[in-house]
UniProtKB/Swiss-Prot annotation:
<keyword id="KW-0784">Thiamine biosynthesis</keyword>
<comment type="similarity">
    <text>Belongs to the thiamine-phosphate synthase family.</text>
</comment>
<keyword id="KW-0479">Metal-binding</keyword>
<keyword id="KW-0808">Transferase</keyword>
<feature type="binding site">
    <location>
        <position position="137"/>
    </location>
    <ligand>
        <name>4-amino-2-methyl-5-(diphosphooxymethyl)pyrimidine</name>
    </ligand>
</feature>
<dbReference type="InterPro" id="IPR036206">
    <property type="entry name" value="ThiamineP_synth_sf"/>
</dbReference>
<keyword id="KW-0460">Magnesium</keyword>
<feature type="binding site">
    <location>
        <begin position="185"/>
        <end position="186"/>
    </location>
    <ligand>
        <name>2-[(2R,5Z)-2-carboxy-4-methylthiazol-5(2H)-ylidene]ethyl phosphate</name>
    </ligand>
</feature>
<feature type="binding site">
    <location>
        <begin position="134"/>
        <end position="136"/>
    </location>
    <ligand>
        <name>2-[(2R,5Z)-2-carboxy-4-methylthiazol-5(2H)-ylidene]ethyl phosphate</name>
    </ligand>
</feature>
<protein>
    <recommendedName>
        <fullName>Thiamine-phosphate synthase</fullName>
        <ecNumber>2.5.1.3</ecNumber>
    </recommendedName>
</protein>
<dbReference type="InterPro" id="IPR034291">
    <property type="entry name" value="TMP_synthase"/>
</dbReference>
<comment type="function">
    <text>Condenses 4-methyl-5-(beta-hydroxyethyl)thiazole monophosphate (THZ-P) and 2-methyl-4-amino-5-hydroxymethyl pyrimidine pyrophosphate (HMP-PP) to form thiamine monophosphate (TMP).</text>
</comment>
<feature type="binding site">
    <location>
        <position position="70"/>
    </location>
    <ligand>
        <name>Mg(2+)</name>
    </ligand>
</feature>
<feature type="binding site">
    <location>
        <position position="89"/>
    </location>
    <ligand>
        <name>Mg(2+)</name>
    </ligand>
</feature>
<feature type="binding site">
    <location>
        <position position="69"/>
    </location>
    <ligand>
        <name>4-amino-2-methyl-5-(diphosphooxymethyl)pyrimidine</name>
    </ligand>
</feature>
<dbReference type="GO" id="GO:0004789">
    <property type="term" value="F:thiamine-phosphate diphosphorylase activity"/>
</dbReference>
<dbReference type="GO" id="GO:0005737">
    <property type="term" value="C:cytoplasm"/>
</dbReference>
Length: 205
């Protein structure tokens, strides 16, 4: 499956401001988002399922891949395109056994060692970060900057997206590393005009 990782949106319902998540995701896709990850923390399984199913109606309509953060059961239940796993989540090999070879599995990495391990274990793509300081990541030691991103990117051969503090003022510097895409939350979701916010993060608009 050929995936376009150029503009990777991660959902966060804290930014809804009374708006409908389905509408936000649709506007983001119309603005240029190429892949959507549904991430829900501290909610029941049923609520996560309902949110993911709702988002999938939109991504299916626009033929955009939908990735589920961490929860393989939710990914299976809605027949998502794949899952994204952190370093402390289920091991990639086990996830692959459960989901099969046709599903996308992405892994979060913060250094070359983690990146090579994920690649060797069969990850389809990597989420590399944290690139810049961000409100959602309080661990300053985890910030790797453009230099850290470049080192990791140069060590691997699979697609990757950069994450962490990326916005319309710095995304071009990130893309100069040759990375396949950028992953954002607030740079799109915290804006009033979702479609425009997404469009402002496209290099070839």
């Amino acid at each position: 499956m050929e995936i376009n990782y150029e503009l990777y949106l991660i959902t966060d319902r804290r930014f809804l401001k009374g708006r409908q998540l389905k509408k936000i995701v649709e506007d983001a896709i119309l603005g240029g988002v190429t892949i959507v990850q549904v991430r829900e923390k501290d909610v029941s399984t049923r609520e996560f399922y309902n949110v993911a199913k709702e988002v999938k109606e939109v991504t299916d309509y626009y033929k955009v891949p939908i990735i589920i953060n961490d929860r393989l059961d939710i990914a299976q239940a809605i027949d998502a395109s794949g899952v994204h796993l952190g370093q402390k989540d289920m091991h990639l090999n086990i996830a692959r056994e459960i989901l099969g070879k046709d599903k996308i599995i992405g892994i979060s990495v913060g250094n070359v060692k983690e990146a090579l391990e994920a690649q060797n274990n069969g990850a389809d793509y990597l989420g590399i970060g944290t690139i810049f300081p961000t409100g959602s990541k309080k661990d300053v030691d985890a910030i790797i900057g453009i230099d850290g991103l470049s080192k990791i990117k140069d060590s691997i051969s699979i697609p990757s997206v950069a994450i962490g503090g990326i916005n319309k003022t710095n995304f071009k510097d990130v893309l100069k590393t040759g990375i396949e895409g950028i992953s954002v939350i607030s740079a799109i979701l915290d804006e009033d005009d979702i479609k425009l916010a997404a469009n402002n993060l496209l290099i070839n608009k």
